């Protein structure tokens, strides 16, 4: 009886091993398929070349890169060499007709504005007076010469 049990155990082990071998081959074939598919995709996108940005895509990219600063369509003075400025290349020339990277896009961003400092009350000029106070002051001084008579208003 013990021999039969051991034989049945060996038979189950053998069948289980064969099942695992088939399963391993199936898994490895699937992995090779996906690996080949990934390589094919990467190769075809690299052969396609760099992309260009035109129209709304260019504006969206500039808004993303520059954020709240805003951007210019032509380079502000002071960017690049003097020979480049003579050609008057703009963002469309550089990123629509050719490909450009993020650094090139960032060159067209407006400069960062320094935060406005709050002025103290002492530093304010008399012209900074609110309009209502100015009008009252003007009314009082524009009454003219009434002599010493007091008029109620």
Curated annotation (Swiss-Prot):
**Top-level taxon:** Eukaryota
Compositional bias segments (type: Basic and acidic residues): 125-138
Question: Where is this protein found?
Answer: Secreted
* Biological process per Gene Ontology, one example term: gene expression
Q: What is its main location?
A: secreted
User: Which cysteines form disulfides?
Assistant: 54-96, 66-109, 95-100
According to the UniProt record, where is the region C? 78-89
- Sorted alphabetically, which keywords does the UniProt record give? Disulfide bond, Growth factor, Secreted, Signal
Spans annotated as D: 111-118
UniProt xrefs under InterPro entries: IGF-I, Insulin-like, Insulin-like_growth_factor, Insulin-like_sf, Insulin_CS, Insulin_family
Q: Where is this region: Disordered?
A: 119-153
Under the GO molecular function aspect, what terms does this record hold? Answer: growth factor activity; hormone activity; insulin-like growth factor receptor binding
Q: Region (B): which ranges? A: 49-77
Q: Which GO terms describe its cellular component?
A: extracellular space
SMART domains this protein is in? IlGF
Q: Does the keyword Transmembrane helix apply?
A: no
Identify the stretch(es) annotated as A. Answer: 90-110
What subunit structure does UniProt give? Answer: Forms a ternary complex with IGFR1 and ITGAV:ITGB3. Forms a ternary complex with IGFR1 and ITGA6:ITGB4. Forms a ternary complex with IGFBP3 and ALS.
Q: What does this protein do?
A: The insulin-like growth factors, isolated from plasma, are structurally and functionally related to insulin but have a much higher growth-promoting activity. Acts as a ligand for IGF1R. Binds to the alpha subunit of IGF1R, leading to the activation of the intrinsic tyrosine kinase activity which autophosphorylates tyrosine residues in the beta subunit thus initiatiating a cascade of down-stream signaling events leading to activation of the PI3K-AKT/PKB and the Ras-MAPK pathways. Binds to integrins.
Homology family = Belongs to the insulin family.
Q: What is this protein called?
A: Insulin-like growth factor 1
Per the UniProt entry, what species is this protein from, by scientific name? Answer: Gallus gallus
Gene for this protein?
Answer: IGF1
């Amino acid at each position: 009886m013990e021999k039969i049990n051991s034989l049945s155990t060996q038979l189950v082990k053998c069948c289980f091993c064969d099942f695992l071998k088939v399963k391993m081959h199936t898994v490895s074939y699937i992995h090779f398929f996906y690996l080949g598919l990934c390589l094919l995709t990467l190769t075809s996108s690299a052969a396609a070349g760099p992309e260009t940005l035109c129209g709304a895509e260019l504006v969206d990219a500039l808004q993303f890169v520059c954020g709240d600063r805003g951007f210019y369509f032509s380079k502000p003075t002071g960017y690049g060499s003097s020979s480049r400025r003579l050609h008057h290349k703009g963002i469309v020339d550089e990123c629509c007709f050719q490909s450009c990277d993020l650094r090139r896009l960032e060159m067209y961003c407006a400069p960062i504005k320094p935060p406005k400092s709050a002025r103290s009350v002492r530093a304010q000029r008399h012209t900074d007076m609110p309009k209502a106070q100015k009008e009252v002051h003007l009314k009082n001084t524009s009454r003219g010469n009434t002599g010493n008579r007091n008029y109620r208003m």
